[in-house]
């Protein structure tokens, strides 16, 4: 059974009539904050993993600049997503791994934004094996106080995983062999980056597995 915010609030009020007025108001104020709280989600990962492309796919619009050769995100880009009665802010953050100078700047930016992030979605390429920069930055965030249970790891470019030529362009889904490859990569990433949530694969440009991603993202929110 589901309730709208107004009907839920009215029902709770009826249950609290026996409490003193001051206590009742404090409970109702807290309930209002919980219901109307807008979580903030940071999207991180190496440059070129498809963070901005994932945002564009979620919003079904080219709201974030992308480029196949150059990183386009240099500052935190805030986007508001409305899902039913719930609003949330997605923060598309600049990707690491381009230059040591940029990484130093981004560490300062990540440190500054970390306290306000309710969830961190970390994007890794499914067709790549070099995760040293990701491991180092993940450890940096943990050392800065990030909650390890607040990370959700996503494999992008699932359509390019071996053997890429077998991607089913008609059905927009991986072949059987690609599915096996994705399972192997998923297991490896889950070992390297322990998380409370399963590792998920997506192919953002063609929309593959995006509904599952959005569902998991909502589930992962506090």
Which functions belong to the PLM regions below?
Residues 159-222:
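Canonical P-loop GTPase G-domain recognition
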